[in-house]
Amino acid sequence: MASQSQGIQQLLQAEKRAAEKVADARKRKARRLKQAKEEAQMEVEQYRREREQEFQSKQQAAMGSQGNLSAEVEQATRRQVQGMQSSQQRNRERVLAQLLGMVCDVRPQVHPNYRISA
């Protein structure tokens, strides 16, 4: 009977060691999964940062050229407005004199299509 008891004890100890090994294996697996998840998250973050930086550089290049274009258009518009204002100042008196001459200098005459019925 003692040998049976000793055999049972050995079986229980072997079962306990097997359960400990299984538990350790599960813990190692959980740690590996957690580590793999963290590494994957870091890779995703790094990729996202790279793509964001690439997008920002492309956006800056596109917006930079648009900024230059808008500045050039603004400057050209100012030059045209200044040219129109100077032209208006130069021609103002002459145009006013012409307009007043046409309005005030009335020459009455019979229209060529008018027929005198007699």
Swiss-Prot record:
- Renumbered to this chain, the Polar residues biased-composition regions fall at 56-69, 78-89
The GO cellular component terms are: clathrin-coated vesicle membrane; melanosome; synaptic vesicle membrane; vacuolar proton-transporting V-type ATPase, V1 domain
Q: Where in the cell is the protein located?
A: Melanosome; Cytoplasmic vesicle, Clathrin-coated vesicle membrane
- Where are the residues of the annotated region Disordered? 23-90
Keywords of the record, alphabetical order, are:
Cytoplasmic vesicle, Hydrogen ion transport, Ion transport, Membrane, Transport
Principal place where this protein is found? other
Mode of membrane association: Peripheral membrane protein
The domain of life for this entry's organism is: Eukaryota
Per the UniProt entry, the signal peptide is: none
Q: Name one GO biological process term.
A: synaptic vesicle lumen acidification
Q: Name one GO molecular function term.
A: ATP hydrolysis activity
Basic and acidic residues composition-biased segments: 35-55
Enumerate the InterPro entries for this protein: V-ATPase_G (IPR005124)
Biological function: Subunit of the V1 complex of vacuolar(H+)-ATPase (V-ATPase), a multisubunit enzyme composed of a peripheral complex (V1) that hydrolyzes ATP and a membrane integral complex (V0) that translocates protons. V-ATPase is responsible for acidifying and maintaining the pH of intracellular compartments and in some cell types, is targeted to the plasma membrane, where it is responsible for acidifying the extracellular environment.
Q: How does it assemble?
A: V-ATPase is a heteromultimeric enzyme made up of two complexes: the ATP-hydrolytic V1 complex and the proton translocation V0 complex. The V1 complex consists of three catalytic AB heterodimers that form a heterohexamer, three peripheral stalks each consisting of EG heterodimers, one central rotor including subunits D and F, and the regulatory subunits C and H. The proton translocation complex V0 consists of the proton transport subunit a, a ring of proteolipid subunits c9c'', rotary subunit d, subunits e and f, and the accessory subunits ATP6AP1/Ac45 and ATP6AP2/PRR.
Q: What is the name listed in the Swiss-Prot or TrEMBL entry for this protein? A: V-type proton ATPase subunit G 2
Provide the species name: Macaca mulatta (Rhesus macaque)
The gene is ATP6V1G2
